[in-house]
């Protein structure tokens, strides 16, 4: 019997290419580019070859104080001041440079006032003549530094107030008592002098009493406060008294969430600011603008814990007076700084203290016919504040 021959080896079938793993499968972005641009913290504009604005993100609308409907289609030359270096940067990019930037650019318009910014212009590539304009306002560190300076000024007044309460009021009581004893046994002509002593002692005591509010170290009792209710209350008080001849303009954002604060203390802040604005405004044609807005604020770390307060609520008080003298600006929030004949110079020092106690930031910008004080305040967040057993006592200056 013939032996069966060995079976010939089967031809090897070529390996089937393995499908790529799902982890390597390219993922196409499914996010609308405008959503990503609106999430950026800086103003962004797209400008075409004709110099017209084609797109603005939310930050750009907030920065320039105009809506997208008003800005898109507007020539950039109508938005920026004449001879702005921004136009030169755009021209450089449209002539072939991929990117151009400049620091220290001043954008100053009647609506927003002066802003010192860094401008970056980048070629989009498609369409070829379109550019992306980014505005970066490097004022955060300056705001925090100024706020801490105001807090230090308030602390110095606090120490002085505590000292005065013990070291001045007690001797004054003795002086006043001695003057009253002298008055019982002196002539009528001398009683004029003893009454003068008593009146001046009372005046000094009243001043010390005003300063003692700075030494109040009790924690703030805070809750959700409607800032528009506060502003309306202060406006009515002002118009019924010291600001009866002032025209008030209200530019409120009705969608603002509540402030995390103390209502009475907030009233004191804005009553002081509005009173100063009314006294600075001209007798004829005086005008005060009260405005509120939501901004992407910084987060301040609170002392003694990990809690951070978001400061997105911006309240502005603007007047059309002559402006703040240059020699007062660097020390404006110090105690006893005033241009008023009978002023004590404690109003703005107290404002700085209360704003700091709320964990907020106060700043000002002044030029002839336009002085504005801006107060950034924390937003009430029930979920966040439920774990914060102790109210805040100012800011530590950390940025997150």
Curated annotation (Swiss-Prot):
Post-translational modification (record): Autophosphorylated.
Localization, UniProt: Cytoplasm
Phosphohistidine modified-residue sites: 166
Positions of the PAS domain: 29-99
Compositionally biased intervals (Low complexity): 1-10, 18-27
UniProt-annotated stretches for the region Disordered: 1-27
Histidine kinase domain: residues covered: 163-381
EC number: 2.7.13.3, 3.1.3.-
GO terms classed as biological process: nitrogen fixation; regulation of DNA-templated transcription
A cellular component term, taken from the record's GO annotations: cytoplasm
InterPro entries from the UniProt entry: HATPase_C_sf (IPR036890), His_kinase_dom (IPR005467), HisK_dim/P_dom (IPR003661), HisK_dim/P_sf (IPR036097), PAS (IPR000014), PAS-like_dom_sf (IPR035965), PAS_fold (IPR013767), Sig_transdc_His_kin-like_C (IPR004358)
One Pfam match: PAS
GO terms, molecular function: ATP binding; hydrolase activity; phosphorelay sensor kinase activity
Protein biosynthesis among keywords: no
Catalytic activity: ATP + protein L-histidine = ADP + protein N-phospho-L-histidine
Protein name, entry field: Sensory histidine kinase/phosphatase NtrB
Natural source organism: Azospirillum brasilense
Taxonomic classification: Bacteria, Pseudomonadati, Pseudomonadota, Alphaproteobacteria, Rhodospirillales
